[in-house]
Amino acid sequence: MDRSWAERRIPELIETIRHHEYLYYVKNEPEISDAAFDELMQELKQLEEAFPDLRRPDSPTQRVGGATAPDFAKVPHQPPMYSLDNAFSEADLRDFDRRVREGLGGEPVSYVCELKIDGLSISLRYEDGLFVQGATRGDGETGEDVTENLRTIGSIPLRLDGTEAPVPPRLIVRGEVYMTKQVLEELNAALAAEGKPLLQNPRNAAAGGLRQKDPRKTRERRLDAFLYQVVDAEALGIADHWSALQRLQAWRFKVNPHRHLAHTIDEVLDWVAGWQARRHELPYEIDGLVIKVNDLAQQRRLGFTSKFPRWAIAYKFPAEERETTVVGISLEVGRTGVVTPSADLAPVRIAGTTVKRATLHNEDYIREKDIRVGDTVIVRKAGEIIPEVVRVVPEKRPPDAQPWTFPKTCPACGAELVRIEGEAATRCTNNLCPAQQYRAILHFASRDAMNIEGLGEALVQSLLDHGLIEDAADLYRLHEKRDALIRLERMGEKSVDNLLAAIDATRQNPLHRLIFALGIRHVGERAARLLADHFGSMEAIEQAGLDELTAIPGLGPKIAESVKNYFASPRSHQLLAKLRAAGVNMVGEKKAGPAEGPLAGMTVVVTGTLVRWSRKEIEELIQQLGGKAAGSVSRKTSFVVAGEAAGSKLQKAQELGIPVLTEDEFCERYLQG
């Protein structure tokens, strides 16, 4: 085989195959048969095998994927991949439009309306036009490197086309990997024939496919991808989102054709109404619609809250309802002892998933709706929302169906169940209940608490079943039981070492994370931060009296009493002693001396909806300015910042004669200079 001929032929084949891939995967307009395409690929493979040094990284043969990945490396996202705030009604969309226009000072604004593909978000990086890295969204700040798996997706170009638009030296684009309904059906038919478990829905199938360790298995999932964002588009001379989508197409990315440029909110609502009726006609699943401010300069001015862009919103379709049968009622014990009833259902497909269980909330809910085993019921589900039984179909009730009564003893440990007067919840009275311990450990390890990576439900249950842990503090002694861990099902040396490293990394977590991780009743993330900031150490919190706790602005008597009760418990003392012995951080960050700034010594209450900040953001700003952000109005309140739809707090401030500032007045007075 002549080398000089191969040097000419390989680039020709790459360009020809790339052209036909684009026509097939992106345009859906193939010009040649599958057999003819396979012949071109086979010729290219043979030439590359004969002359390995001529194989290019953007060769279509590289879509087959590289070697099996032992683990997925972490990839930081810059800027973060934010999630979107949700709208569920016309009123929500009109409110979004109002906030946008107010934030822009009444400027004209147009919106790009797009489909919200129900898949897995990805970020792709190109260097000099060559695809070099792809990552999942992860938590928005950090994702997983799935480059080799993304190479197997035919609609993702390995090299960008610069024919219609110049290709920048460095480019980051974002989009969604998905699976079509037809591919899901075909894969499930093959799985059923082999007697294997079926894939539940296209989204889960796509997510699972993209996280396969072997890229060849990813390729078997026949995934696809739509791209919808150019990061730092303004730096590339792109002025608006609509033009960014066109630029993506020019580079030969696959961009969803179902989009609309609207110049008024009424146009947006018309487009939304149209897709509400047509969404089931699509060959893939969507879980809503996305509305974005078109002008990129306006997007930049509107900015972000701590979680969402202010210039975009996701419209969620109304919850789907289906009829099914209650085959049983089961109970689940939570970390604080609350026992929650659930309806065991005859399987029914709702919102793209098979639903076998729905929450019944509490005893009163069951009694009010008179839900009985054997009843035909209407079950509602929307997106990731937990399914719930909304009503009984009385005319279909079996004649022998009996009213359901709450049991007197805990299903997990047999202890007495009690219901405190004035509360809807029924609780297990046994602090040593294994179900409570299981849930408490899961909460301790969860992302917003200690954030122990790799410690999921199955592993926690296995650790408890094998007697390796009894409580959360025992996690920090698992390094002493490494051999026993390795013997657990699905746990090899690599997995065990990763788990132990993840646990060890949390010893120096901030104090507020540990406080939240303890699972104190009524203490959420905000209250945990208040406690950490006020006391500065776990020891100080333990010694605090009820009056001191109640006096903390924003904490309130209910939380204060719960905190006091928690630290009065001998079992809590035992847990904290074990955590201290394990070297878990019990001290907060040292604060600067007396608060300085324009709000030094002031207590500020925020009420209503603000244009510039979320509630969390303005409370953090108040603290940065030296003040305290409180959750309720009292005579100690210095002033109130009142936004749109301010309620009882505003009324109380007026009754007490406490100054009330608008958002603009607050900015002028405390943020100027």
Curated annotation (Swiss-Prot):
Belongs to the NAD-dependent DNA ligase family. LigA subfamily. NCBIfam families: dnlj, PRK07956.1. GO terms for molecular function: DNA binding; DNA ligase (NAD+) activity; metal ion binding. Its cofactor is Mg(2+); Mn(2+). One of its GO terms (biological process) is DNA repair. It catalyses: NAD(+) + (deoxyribonucleotide)n-3'-hydroxyl + 5'-phospho-(deoxyribonucleotide)m = (deoxyribonucleotide)n+m + AMP + beta-nicotinamide D-nucleotide. Residues 54-73 are annotated as: Disordered. NAD(+) binds at D34, A35, A36, F37, D38, S83, L84, E114, R137, E176, K292, K316. The keyword Cell membrane does not apply. Residues 594-673 form the BRCT domain. DNA ligase that catalyzes the formation of phosphodiester linkages between 5'-phosphoryl and 3'-hydroxyl groups in double-stranded DNA using NAD as a coenzyme and as the energy source for the reaction. It is essential for DNA replication and repair of damaged DNA. This is DNA ligase. InterPro entries: BRCT_dom, BRCT_dom_sf, DisA/LigA_HHH, DNA_ligase, DNA_ligase_AS, DNAligase_adenylation, DNAligase_N, Hlx-hairpin-Hlx_DNA-bd_motif. Keywords: DNA damage, DNA repair, DNA replication, Ligase, Magnesium, Manganese, Metal-binding, NAD, Zinc.
